[in-house]
Structures are given as C-alpha cells and as structure tokens.
C-alpha cells in the first residue's frame, strides 16, 4: 500500500527518532532554537516528543500539533546529527498522525491545497498576481506574497557587461541532443510569483535541447507538509504519469526538485507504482545540476557582484552546492556569503504562520548579505526568493534579489 495508516506513520516516526541519543549537536544549527532558545523548538526536543507519543507516554493534542508544526523542515539538524536522525521526516509523519486525529488539516491548508491541485486555478492566480503588480496593488498583500519581480531586463540595464560569452563548453558528463526529451517542471511558486524567471528558465533550456512541453501538476510538498497526504500521493501519481516519456525532468524550484527526487520512497511498498516512481525520481534534475552536466555557459557576463543563498531543499535536500556557484562565477564576480546555507525562514508557509520567528531569521540573512557588498543575491527557490525580495527592499536598494535563471 502507498498510504500508511496513522498508527503506521507514528510507529515509523518513533523508529526514526529512537536513534537520537540527546547529544544536542542539533541545537546550535537550528535557526528556531537560535531564535527561541526553547528545547521543544530544536530537533532534540521534537525527537523526545515524537518518541513519547509513539510509546504512549503522552496524549495527542492540538497543542502538540502546534509544537511539531513549529519546524522549518530545513534538515540542518539532520546534516549535523552523528546518528543522522531524519527529524524532518519524522515531523512530517507526526504532523499527519496528529492532523488526522484532529479531524483533518486546518481550513487554510485545505484551501491552499485545493488551489494547488488545480492547474487552471494556479494559472488564474498567476494572471491575477500579474495584474496586481502592473496596477501597483501588490504591496497590499501581506508577507510579501505578491513580490515585485526584478527581471532580467532590469538586471541587464543596470549591470550588462561589454560582450556576450562564446559558445557553450563541451558537455562534461551527459550528452543532450535534439533527440533527448527534456521537460521543464514548472512549479506553482515560479508560475505565480516569479513568471519572468520561469520564462528565462525555458529560454535557457531551449538553448541546450528541444524542450518537451508538459503541463505538470503541483509537486505536492505543501500537501505533504500540512497533513494532506492523500492529496500529495494523488499529485505524485499524476506527475509520474505525465513525465514517463521524458528522459530528463528539470526543475528550477529547489523545493519541487527535492520532493520529486524523493517520490520513490513514498511508493516503496506499492508494487503497482514502485518502479514507475523510482524511474521518475531518477530523471529529475535541478536546473543548475542539468546545466553543469551539459556544459552551459551564461549568456552574458555582467558587471555585477553576486552572492548566493543556498535553499535548504537544494543544499541538504539534493546535495547541490557547486553548480550554482560556478555558473555565477562565469556570469560575473562572486563573493561567498557567511552562513549561506542557513535557512532564510521562508519554509513554505512558515513565514506566514510564524512571521515573528521568520522575521528574526531573515534579519540575520539580511546582515550577512549586506556584509558581502554584493549587488545581487541569487537563489534557486521561489520560496527563498520571496524572503530575499523582502530584505532587498528593506536594505534600501543596497542589493537586489533574483532567481539564478535571470542572471545566467
């Protein structure tokens, strides 16, 4: 079966966190523990809660759900943990268990999940946000959810170098020809929040191969993170079917890419979908990962200094750090940022649900960006870009925030 029962999810979470020996190595790297300094905000505290819940030592309550929801799922604790306890995965399972016992997901998450399950509604929302930007009313939206997009045209006007680069370098590992079926997975965040960046991604991909057009569904991460597991699995099956004929599936959203690469784990016990899911996950690549494989060079070198923010779902979710940096070094000057891989506080809807904590995390990121002296901070995740756009505005014009597809 591809759907675990509530008890199975809790049992699995208990097994995951049972490896925690409470050493506390996770606490210094947890952004939320750094903000709150409370045991339950860090992985050690959450692991203790999950284990007690699985063992029957504490009762499931709505308050307990609030505690496990207060997690960025950034995986910083997992990377630091000597035992590699997957606290993020355990928290997702515990959330699902507690959500089901509470009678279902919160109404706002059901609403968001319902919107993202319908591509036509997502497209309509994208058009509405575009209209708001043109009218100047986007600033009325809270939490930066209708950001002003700093486009490639703006960028080239301000930072264009004297000459475009030459032809692309020979492929370093994978040969992609006109016969290779490369598909672009356009995430909801890119389509609604940063459509110009999504268009730039398509333009870049067309320079490397003949792009296969596919109208994908949401990756399902918002559903998985908020106790809507059935919706997540339904979307996963739809995307697996849609992309079965593609050779490569490229994502320019770190969150989408990480989710799609791990779909196989959710169907490991389902004979009907196990192999199909594994085949799909195996051909998903991040945009920068793909471009490194085919030897892509930026379209133009800019008179700009870049710095880079590592999305959690790219650096820890996919283990990708160097490809985006190498592309930025080829596109202009590059300077490394302090704590570049620390979460920006976006984490899906976390910055909406917990604006104070997210704001404190983001303020640290702003200071680190400004210390680089860079003119542009670049990232590869629309969720992160929403956050970075906020601090770019707060900086008073000291820097701009852009998706990597817009500068290469």
Task: Label the predicted regions.
Residues 1-18:
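Generic start-of-chain signal for non-secretory N-termini
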Residues 25-28, 48, 66, 130, ...:
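Generic structural signal for well-ordered, non-membrane alpha-helices
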Residues 1-6, 33-63, 84-112, 397-405:
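Non-heme iron-sulfur electron-transfer modules
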Residues 14-33, 61, 65-85, 341-342:
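Cysteine-centered iron-sulfur cluster-binding motifs in ferredoxin-type domains/subunits
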Residues 9-10, 87-408:
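Iron-sulfur cluster-binding electron-transfer modules in prokaryotic oxidoreductases
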Residues 25-28, 39-42, 209-213:
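N-terminal glycine-rich anion-binding loops that anchor highly charged ligand groups
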């Amino acid at each position: 079966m591809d759907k675990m029962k509530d008890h199975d999810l809790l049992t699995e979470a208990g097994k995951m966190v049972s490896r925690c020996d409470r050493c506390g190595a996770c606490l210094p790297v947890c952004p939320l523990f750094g903000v709150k300094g409370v045991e339950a905000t860090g992985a050690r505290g959450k692991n203790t809660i999950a284990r007690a819940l699985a063992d029957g030592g504490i009762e499931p309550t709505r308050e307990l759900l609030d505690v496990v929801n207060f997690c960025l799922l950034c995986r910083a604790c997992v990377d630091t943990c000597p035992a590699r306890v997957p606290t993020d995965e355990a928290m997702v399972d515990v959330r699902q268990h507690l959500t089901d016992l509470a009678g279902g997901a919160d109404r706002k998450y059901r609403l968001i999940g319902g919107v993202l399950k319908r591509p036509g509604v997502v497209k309509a929302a994208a058009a509405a946000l575009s209209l708001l930007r043109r009218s100047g009313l986007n600033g009325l939206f809270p939490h930066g959810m209708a950001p002003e997009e700093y486009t490639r045209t703006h960028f080239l006007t301000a930072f264009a170098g004297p000459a475009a680069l030459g032809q692309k370098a020979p492929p370093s590992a994978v040969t992609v020809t006109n016969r290779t079926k490369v598909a672009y997975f356009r995430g909801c965040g890119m389509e609604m929040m940063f459509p110009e960046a999504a268009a730039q991604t398509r333009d870049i991909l067309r320079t490397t191969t003949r792009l296969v057009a596919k109208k994908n569904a949401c990756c399902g991460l918002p559903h998985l993170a908020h106790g809507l597991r059935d919706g997540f699995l339904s979307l996963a099956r739809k995307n697996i079917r849609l992309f079965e004929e593609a050779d490569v599936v490229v994502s320019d959203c770190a969150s989408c890419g990480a989710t799609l690469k791990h779909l196989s784990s959710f169907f490991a016990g389902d004979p009907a979908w196990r192999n199909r899911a594994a085949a799909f996950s195996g051909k998903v690549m991040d945009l920068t990962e793909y471009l490194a494989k085919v030897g892509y060079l930026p379209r133009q070198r800019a008179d700009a200094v870049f710095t880079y923010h590592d999305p959690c779902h790219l650096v820890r979710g996919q283990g990708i750090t160097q490809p985006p940096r190498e592309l930025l070094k080829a596109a202009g000057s590059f300077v490394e940022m302090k704590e570049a891989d620390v979460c920006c506080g976006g984490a899906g809807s976390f910055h909406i649900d917990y604006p104070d904590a997210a704001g404190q995390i983001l303020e640290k990121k702003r200071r680190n960006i400004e210390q680089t002296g860079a003119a542009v901070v670049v990232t590869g995740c629309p969720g992160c870009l929403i956050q970075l756009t906020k601090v770019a505005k707060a900086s008073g014009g000291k820097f701009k925030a852009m998706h990597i597809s817009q500068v290469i």
